[in-house]
Amino acid sequence: MAGKARVHELAKELGVTSKELLATLKEQGEFVKSASSTVEAPVARRLRESFPSAGGAETKSETGAAAPAARPAAKPGAPSPSAAKPGGPRPGPKPAAPAPAAPAAPAPAAPAAPAAAAPAAPSAPVPTPTFNAPKPAQPARPAPAAPAASAPAAPAAPAAPSTGAKPGGPRPGPKAPRVGNNPYSSAPAERPAPRPAPGAPRPGAGQGGSRPAPGQGGPRPAPGQGGPRPAPGQGGPRPAPGQGGPRPPAGQGGPRPSPGSMPPRPNPGAMPARSARPAPGGGGRPGRPGGAPGGRPGGGGGGYRGGGAPGAGAGAGAPGGAAPAGGFRGRPGGGGRPGQRGAAAGAFGRPGGAVRRGRKSKRAKRAEYESMQAPAVGGVRLPRGNGETIRLARGASLSDFADKIDANPAALVQALFNLGEMVTATQSVNDETLELLGGEMNYVVQVVSPEDEDRELLDSFDLTYGEDAGGEEDLESRPPVVTVMGHVDHGKTRLLDVIRKANVREGEAGGITQHIGAYQVLTELEGNERLVTFIDTPGHEAFTAMRARGAKATDLAILVVAADDGVMPQTVEAINHAQAADVPIVVAVNKIDKEGANPDKIRQQLTEYGLVAEEYGGDTMFVDISAKQGLNIDALLEAVLLTADASLDLRANPDMDAQGVAIEAHLDRGRGPVATVLIQRGTLRVGDSIVAGDAYGRVRRMVDEHGQDVHEALPSRPVQVIGFTSVPGAGDNLLVVDEDRIARQIADRRNARKRNALAAKSRKRISLDDLDAALKEHSQLNLILKGDNSGTVEALEEALLGIPIDDEVQLRVIDRGVGGITETNVNLAAASNAIIIGFNVRAEGKATELANREGVDIRYYSVIYQAIDEVEKALKGLLKPVYEEVELGKAEIRAMFRSSKIGNIAGCLVTSGSIRRNAKARLIRDSKVIAETVTISSLKREKEDATEVREGYECGLTVTYSDIKIGDVLECYELREKPRD
């Protein structure tokens, strides 16, 4: 093979499939993509060595090629056919009944000699003129004790007809019977079964007419023609070993037996039970049993189609239609039993005889039984489970489900369609639909939570998150992480400003915190300087996720409550977050310097939520402070450190790979994606390969809260990390891995999982019931959100999706991101008819010009509740208008006039309100509504057209309802749009 070998070429050479060869290559550690890929020469050599069957196949093919070559060579190579035949006694015209005189001498030797000749037939080319040898014997009874003299006689008999006899005159039976093929050479009672061997015919089963006369035989083959055998049942396979052996070459047969040497014909009473049954082919009487003088077997049965029993037309006992010692060519349909040896199809179809159905295997029966038990949904057969649990990721498709249960995805699609759900095979499906489909098939579908799925993902890379490596001796103390929580405007950021001696509050829009910040400050306790890490969380209701995130990443929480305001909804929510995270709480009662402040009231209110002050016998420390005046700030810090030392084990291993959490992230114009990361364990260094959520990268730079570069960050240290390829999500776990390749693979798989889950969540389920409504035009508000950091975008999206609106209107966030508004966002908005909301960001470059040209609406906000209010108003504007009915007046019909052009004209008196032309009216008769919607088509006052007639005036009018009578009342009304609340 020139050049490199391809996989499919090697598979063809080795006699295996390409799939098997690919599996072998995979086991050997070779990466081959497909069957058309090439492999190197050493690999190909190893493959040839690993498949020994290839060599065996070659040897087998060589042997098989040699065998046919040797076989025809023997025929012309036997020079003695003509010499051998005259040497033996050859019967002339056969007498009518020579059988009774001859059988005495050869009968005893008949059973043993041919049976022993079968195994020795190929090795005995020299014929022996023994008259006992050609007698047919039972093909299935080997006799090991046969005399050796009988062995060379076996091939002698059938060899004669292949070359033909020299003397002239056609003879019907020029061939001697084959040794071992006469089923009647021994007593029939010795046969254990009617069919001695799979390919052998039943004795006497051939349907035949009368035997031809001695001189009426067909033309014998010309001398020297040793090729085709004029066997009646030719085309059947050679008999198996033990059934007479292979046919010897022509010209090596013994002398033709005389009539006196033939065994007596058995009487019908000695026949086997099944031999007397007519052949399945039908159409003629059963063939003669054979064994007549001259060695001619029974003839073929009558009937053209299917011509008799298996083996019809063959010699008596010839296995599977093999050439007999004599007789004419059999009728069509000859051959062995259908489905067995000798059952080759001929020009007239399959061999004759009734078709017998084979027995089903256990596997086939099992498959049929399981298909009967399989559930059918709408005519679709589905696999049946036994209550097995199938684990699927959130947002999995039907193809994923089908792979788990080894089913056809198309069947699952059709089954869901019959259940009323329209999905495709690759579409992300929500959890309820997967559970519904699994229940129909008796499977328990378990949707894996994102946490478990992420844990399994990390386990596949031999990574763990959340545990310190090493033992107790490797742990070192670390600073506590404190989160400041509370209601909006209760003074959380002002408290942090006092602690940090900075002013962050003035920089926040609207005076409320819309970001989550992390700082590390140095404080003093009992003469020792201690580091404390503070995390500031927003108090606005839209930032619930931020507060929950801050509670999870913290060791201790400071709950700020205004003394003049009391416990508020976000205060309760902050308490719940802290208690859910099992975080101890220190309560700071702020604004005690204001009038109306009542710290005792705060203590009483918080008692209802499980925060009992120490002075009330509890274990929660309360500190009264004033962030504005700076009162008791040191006492608050001391309480924080005391609580942390008393109830927390603040230790971590700084020598392991860093693990942490991304508190917030944003896109900086000059630095790219920037994430504020809190290190929880290990040490983060510049140059480490990191992955956080679906973002990955390498640490290029780290900056602390003061803008100073940091080369390594120890546990409990908040830093800004620069070097991500994309903006990570707020709250994503940060992990250091060995190399960038692993980080990229983890990020890509997380991104795919997130995308599938989002697709399953955002796509509305369309059932067959509401298909008509779904196809109609419906109102939908598409939004594109851009913000200054990921936490704000997340909070804004959750707040907008939580707006209570009617089902008639849908709110869909088609894109979200961190950073300025780009031209790509504008193009997407123009294509999807969306509105762009920029939160603390502006349009970049020519995005504004493109938006004006495309007619895209861009809204800028700096306070989150303003964005929520305006989007809510826009959604309510998309709702279908709600109308209310306003009564205009009533008119009583006093007279009726008939006009050939117009029809009925009603003369009315307006009893109340006014009547207007083209207004809607209700026809009332005897206090019953006759017509609900009637339009006043024309209105006249005297002979002049009028648009309105007031109370007390008469008028003439026509309506779009003909059945009006005197005394009817027309109640006129109009529909006015009702403003929504």
Swiss-Prot record:
**UniProt keyword Transmembrane present:** no
Which organism encodes this protein?
Rhodococcus erythropolis (strain PR4 / NBRC 100887)
Per the record, where are the segments of Low complexity compositional bias?
Answer: 64-87, 112-121, 146-165, 270-279
> Positions of the region G4?
590-593
- Positions of the UniProt region annotated as Disordered: 31-370
Gene Ontology CC entries for this record: cytosol
Give the span(s) annotated as G2: 511-515
Segment G5: which positions?
A: 626-628
Q: In which residue ranges is the amino acid composition biased (Gly residues)? A: 280-339
Q: Which family does it belong to?
A: Belongs to the TRAFAC class translation factor GTPase superfamily. Classic translation factor GTPase family. IF-2 subfamily.
* Stretches with biased composition (Basic residues): 356-365
Q: What does this protein do?
A: One of the essential components for the initiation of protein synthesis. Protects formylmethionyl-tRNA from spontaneous hydrolysis and promotes its binding to the 30S ribosomal subunits. Also involved in the hydrolysis of GTP during the formation of the 70S ribosomal complex.
Protein name, as recorded: Translation initiation factor IF-2
Primary location: cytoplasm
Region: G3, residue numbers: 536-539
Which Gene3D superfamilies does this entry report, sorted A to Z? 1.10.10.2480, P-loop containing nucleotide triphosphate hydrolases (3.40.50.300), Translation factors (2.40.30.10), Translation initiation factor IF- 2, domain 3 (3.40.50.10050)
Region (G1), start-end ranges: 486-493
- A GO molecular function for this record? translation initiation factor activity
Gene that specifies this protein: infB
Q: Which PANTHER family match?
A: TR-TYPE G DOMAIN-CONTAINING PROTEIN, TRANSLATION INITIATION FACTOR IF-2-RELATED
